Design a protein with these regions (language model features):
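Transmembrane alpha-helix boundary and packing residues in multipass membrane permease domains
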Residues: 28, 55, 72, 85, ...
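Short runs within selected transmembrane alpha-helices of multi-pass transporters and secretion channels
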Residues: 12-32, 39-47, 68-84, 164-167, ...
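Helix-loop interface residues and adjacent transmembrane-helix termini in multi-pass membrane transporters
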Residues: 32-33, 60-62, 140-143, 180, ...
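A generic alpha-helix surface/boundary motif
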Residues: 24-25, 50-52, 115, 128-132, ...
Length: 325
């Protein structure tokens, strides 16, 4: 049943969490060093390993959705190994300049966590939203619906990884141009990042609209008893997967801009408001429209994240002002 599927997926997927957290650290380091190539290589490798391993476990060993979870575990840990290797190769000279006494000096560590308090709150909100999405799907006590929601969310993840690249670029370049007091370059950079993010969103709308059945077919073994029912049920909700890229065009880029400009309070506040709206919309509309309420809440949650940040910075004027100071 649905609860057993969630149980198996959770207790397999949880082993990827430590590696996932480590990758955040490595990507942050590389981005801060103005190096977007290494995070890109890591992200591409993680995705290739995730897809190939998941396909092998699902179709080669018949592990179903648990195979996808173990694919995530293998992919995340592969990403960590690659991150360590690239860090040593690229920054070997820098790494020889620190002492372990600096690493275990708790006063700087305490300040570090205070500075990153807003980012931690944002991360907790993201975890809460995605965890609740899976939990709410399971509580509907319909294995087909749980499978559909999980697969459609995986399809959306393909888009999120693409836009993450522009978010990292916006993060690194925003910090660079603000530090250099180069307002003109900052305006040009942010305009291009937002433009490319929108273009990628429109591209994925077309991809999902035309090839959503083929994308689902990657995760569903043809000829299985429930395959046709899963595809048929997914068709009832595919409109959300088409709309979500449009709603998500801005939040990924805006997050990068806020981190690069150290305006993390704006990011935190917009995330808190969006998360409250997410739960409010779901609980208000679920008795009326059922599973559609979950997808509507998620779509508006993504839309609000970007829109609120844009409004709170007065359409980025506050960010540009930092570069002009």
């Amino acid at each position: 049943n649905g609860n057993e599927i969630v149980h198996d997926y959770f207790y397999a997927r949880i082993w990827a969490v430590p590696a996932g957290i480590m990758l955040f650290g490595f990507n942050g380091w590389d981005t801060g060093m103005q190096n977007a190539v290494i995070p890109m290589c890591i992200a591409v490798t993680v995705n290739i390993v995730h897809v190939s391993t998941s396909l092998w476990l699902v179709f080669g060993h018949g592990m179903g959705i648990t195979g996808i979870a173990y694919g995530s575990v293998v992919a995340q840990n592969t990403g960590v190994l690659l991150a360590v290797l690239l860090l040593i190769l690229r920054y070997r000279k820098i790494l020889t300049r620190f002492t372990w006494r600096e690493v275990v000096d708790w006063e700087p560590v305490r300040k570090f966590f205070l500075i990153n308090r807003d980012i931690i709150v944002r991360t907790l909100c993201i975890v809460a939203v995605y965890t609740f999405f899976t939990a709410a799907s399971a509580r509907m006590e319909d294995p087909i619906l749980l499978t559909v929601n999980t697969l459609l969310l995986q399809i959306f993840t393909l888009f999120s990884y693409m836009n993450d690249g522009f978010a990292y670029a916006a993060e690194a370049l925003t910090g660079r141009f603000i530090g250099a007091r180069d307002e003109q370059s900052l305006r040009r950079c942010l305009g291009r990042c937002l433009g490319w993010g929108t273009l990628i969103s429109v591209l994925f709308v077309g991809i999902y609209l035309i090839w959503w059945r083929d994308l689902l077919g990657i995760f569903i073994k043809a000829g299985t008893p429930d395959a046709a029912q899963v595809v048929s049920t997914a068709g009832n909700y595919i409109v959300w997967i088409i709309l979500i890229p449009l709603a998500s065009a801005m939040p990924f880029i805006m997050d990068g801009i806020m981190v690069g400009a150290t305006e993390t309070k704006v990011m935190r506040n917009s995330m808190l408001l969006s998360t409250v709206a997410y739960f409010g919309i779901f609980y208000s509309l679920y008795p009326v429209i059922g599973n559609n309420a979950l997808w509507l809440a998620f779509t508006l949650y993504m839309f609000l994240r970007g829109t609120l940040q844009l409004l709170m910075t007065r359409r980025l004027r506050l960010i540009y002002r930092k570069a002009a100071a």
